[in-house]
Every structure is written in C-alpha cells, then in structure tokens.
C-alpha cells in the first residue's frame, strides 16, 4: 500500500510546474494499472502496517477511486481550456484521491473517521470553486451540515467503544459483539445513513450534484456515496445482535423511500437532478440488502455499489457533454439529440440500460442478489421491490426517450458531435461495468 500512497503524494510536487494536467492524469492511470496487478485473493487484511491494511472490500473501492479520479481529469477538459486555476483543481482531486485511499485502508476506527470526514473538504472546494451557479454556496452548506452533524455521534460512539474494549482496531473488534446498547447503535450508523444517503436524509445529494462541476458529480456519485456502505459493512461486524433488533426500520424506510424517489424522478426536468435522484433510489435498495445482514445481501450490496459507481458517473459525464454543447441541463432543450449527436446516442443507450440493470451489466448481478436477500428476509417486501424495479426502468426510459427522441430544439444552429476524448471517457465507464460480470468472484466472494 505504501508504494501507491507515496506515488500519489509525490504527484503533489508537480503542481509547482505549468502544463502538467495530462501528465498527472497519465500518472493516475499508471497507478491504477499497477494497483490492478496487485489483486490479492486474500479475504483477510493483508499488507498490514500500524494503521493501514487492505482486504477484498477495500481493494475494490480503492481501485474504483483510482479509476474515477483518472476519468474525472479526462472529463474536466474545460478547466484546462479556460485555464481555470488548473493546478489548484489538480491538487483538490489528488488530495481527495489520497484521502479516499486512506479511508478505505484504515484499520483503526478513529483513523477511518478522520479520513472519512477529510474527504468532504476537497469535495466542498470542488463544488464552491468550479461549480456553475451562485446557488452552489447553499449546496455546499447543505453538504457540510448534513454530513458533519450526523458524524458527531459517530465520533462519540467510537470513543465509547475505545473506552469499553481498549482498542479501536477493526480486526480486534470483529471478535466482540455489542449487546443492549441501542443508543450506541444509532450513533454508529447514522453518519453512514446520511452519507449513503437514506431517504429522508437525502436532501443534500440532489443539491450538491446539480451545483457541482462534472468532476464533483463523478466523484460524488462514483465513490463518496460508497463510503456510507463501506462504513456500514465494517461497523456491522460488531453489531450483529443490535442489527437483528432494529434493521427492519431502515429496510422499510429505504424501500418505500426508493419507490417515492423513483416517482420524483419521473417529473424531473433537470438532467443532473434526475440522475441524482436515481442514485438515491439505487442506494435505497443497496441499504436494504445490507441491513438484511445475509450473505447474498452483503455481497449484492457491494456489487451494486461498484456497478452504480461506474454507471452513474458515466451518466453524469453524458449530462455534462450535453450541457457543454447546449448551455442548459433542461430536458426541454436537450431533446432530439439522436438527430445531431447520433454517435453519442449509443452511449446514452448503453449507460441507461446499465442504470436499469439490463444484462450483461454488473448492476444486474447486484440487483438479483439483493432481490434474493430482501425477499428472503420478508415476503412483504416484494410489493415495494416490484414497484422499485418497474419505476427504475420507467424513469431511465423517460430520460433516454426525452433526451434522444423528438424534435430538435429550434434555438440550436451549430453543434460539435463529440470528441475522441469524450468517447474514451464513456467507454472506460462502460467497459468495466460489463466486463466485471465475467469476473464476479471479485465482487461476490469476499466474505
């Protein structure tokens, strides 16, 4: 692990030079390739140092962080074109990548909390510094207050566990099981529920997505939402008994909330808001599967987290490509694109079909195992799951049909069909999404 952390840290010295944007992007992809070679089939923590280690759960999410950060730099070519504080932008992204690697490889609960919160700072600066509308200040405040307010009880919970067990190490604590500490259970999981985000505490997400630049949206949808799921996977190892007692509450809220959010998607007119709300619906089903605490549920939630990271990041990339051409995110203006961006319509179709879990995407594998686990937990959930699956397909088709079909907006007179760079970014989102299903033991057999 240390070699990758040092590689990323030494990239910081490049920021004193000019014209190093694409070099940094190439270095991040080089680090990704080196990290891919390092795949271990070790289901326990390996590469252990004093505070850092890596197992199969963290491996997939660190790899996703590397991949998405490389693609963010490819997608944000506008920053270089307009020379919009390029080196500061690079610093934010590389610092965010470093924080994410630290978060996913922390073995101490307190270190995990520290880096979990630190990843918020560069995200906030990305939204405030490179966002488009003046409302980004409000979005930044929403993001900050929701996550910080929910995280304070987590800190108290961590110190309580330290006091009780004399350790904060995940491995040591996995042999413990906490009983009769209902308030501690709420303290420990509430921060992760907000980060996921669970329905009812999801209001910061659409705001943050709509105001963020393309890089902010990609990392937010791709990796930062997964921090919540990762935290729950780690914390539930010491809260199984309390989970059996209370988890039905979160499953009910998530499934009913998922259906309601899917309905909200159907009357969205903003491309980015629609994709952001669809993220909330997907994370609802991930959360439900996680809370069943079954083998299928945990594996399925992890698989869908990785699949959703690639898929929704690609969709935000597509929305940005349209926004750069049209100057608007409205579906009333971004319509009839099949007429003047036909080559891009293929990518819209492929990523939309991934979003509604069509085969052979990784989303399908995740959703099938999640459906299995949630239905085995209770037959009643079939009702809301049926609605969720149906509306998920409905709003994705609505997005595709409205944006690609119909008459062209009459105000458009000149259009660039798309550059090789944009097609490459989209292909690098779509390829792993469809190829990973061939190597699904990487996602499914880590328990």
Curated annotation (Swiss-Prot):
> An example of a Gene Ontology BP annotation on this entry?
electron transport coupled proton transport
Report the function annotation for this chain. Answer: Core subunit of the mitochondrial membrane respiratory chain NADH dehydrogenase (Complex I) that is believed to belong to the minimal assembly required for catalysis. Complex I functions in the transfer of electrons from NADH to the respiratory chain. The immediate electron acceptor for the enzyme is believed to be ubiquinone.
Highest classification ranks of the organism: Eukaryota, Metazoa, Ecdysozoa, Arthropoda, Hexapoda
* Transmembrane domains' residue ranges: 28-48, 56-76, 85-105, 110-130, 141-161, 183-203, 213-233, 246-266, 273-293, 301-321, 343-365, 380-400, 409-431
Originating organism: Aedes aegypti
The protein depicted here goes by the name NADH-ubiquinone oxidoreductase chain 4
Which compartment or compartments is the protein found in?
A: Mitochondrion membrane
InterPro entries given in the database record = NADH4_N (IPR000260), NADH_UbQ_OxRdtase (IPR003918), ND/Mrp_TM (IPR001750)
**Molecular function (Gene Ontology), one example:** NADH dehydrogenase (ubiquinone) activity
Catalytic activity, per the record? a ubiquinone + NADH + 5 H(+)(in) = a ubiquinol + NAD(+) + 4 H(+)(out)
State its Enzyme Commission number(s): 7.1.1.2
Q: Does the keyword Ligase apply?
A: no
Protein family membership: Belongs to the complex I subunit 4 family.
- The EC class name is translocase
* Primary gene name: mt:ND4
Q: Name one Pfam family in it.
A: Proton_antipo_M
